[in-house]
Amino acid sequence: MTTPPGVLALVTVAALWGALAGALLPRAAHRFAVPWEERDGGWRATCPGGHPIRGWLGPARCARCAERRSGRPADTGPAAPAAPYASGAVRLPLLTAVVCAALAAATGVRPELVVWLLLAPAGVLLAAVDLRVRRLPDPLTLPLAAAALVLLGPAALLPEHAGHWTTALLGALALGAGYLALHLANPGGMAFGDVKLALSMGAVLGWYGWATVMLGTFAAFLLGALYGGALAVAGRAGRRTMIAFGPFMLAGTLAGLLVGAYTA
């Protein structure tokens, strides 16, 4: 079976968008990756060398750190290339490109694809931050939930859409309530940041119906359990070991969304 040229072009454009958007994430990932014990500061304002960081988007590189490492003042010749102060320069664009390409392939030419492509970089950013410091910052989780519902509103008014805004709203409320119940029952096992992220998950998955909500939720817990089990077997984790659950929530959401979009 050959891939139609239109679909191939759509996937290619989506992958390019993902790569470009992902290339802007390393600096934001560094700034938001504040450990829990330092959270009162909100976010990082300096690189590890103590130099101020300008802006939120772009590569995580510092020209002043490069000058210090080279031992050459900036006014003695050509400026040294800016030195990286955080990882992700390759991984984040690549991952975002793959995610966006997969979403385009599954969704096709539908209005909601624009929403998925706009939300995907934020999801990758959240996963990167949670993996680094096991924390999901409020400035990312809550606006993401609001953005999902706001953006899906116009999509529901356009022809050829394959979802429902009402179930997106109800999905956000239902999944948020479910995660809140888990948090109240076991605060040490389910962080409140996961509860806020669940609002976005429910909105995105709910667009394609309750079956997609259940599939994405199940996939998140399955992936998290498999990862935790693998760590336990390897002797790297015990019953009280805390793991970042946000990336598995996002991966489960992606899996459910791909299935929901493809079968819609």
PLM ranges: what are they?
Residues M1-A264:
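A membrane-topology feature that recognizes alpha-helical transmembrane segments
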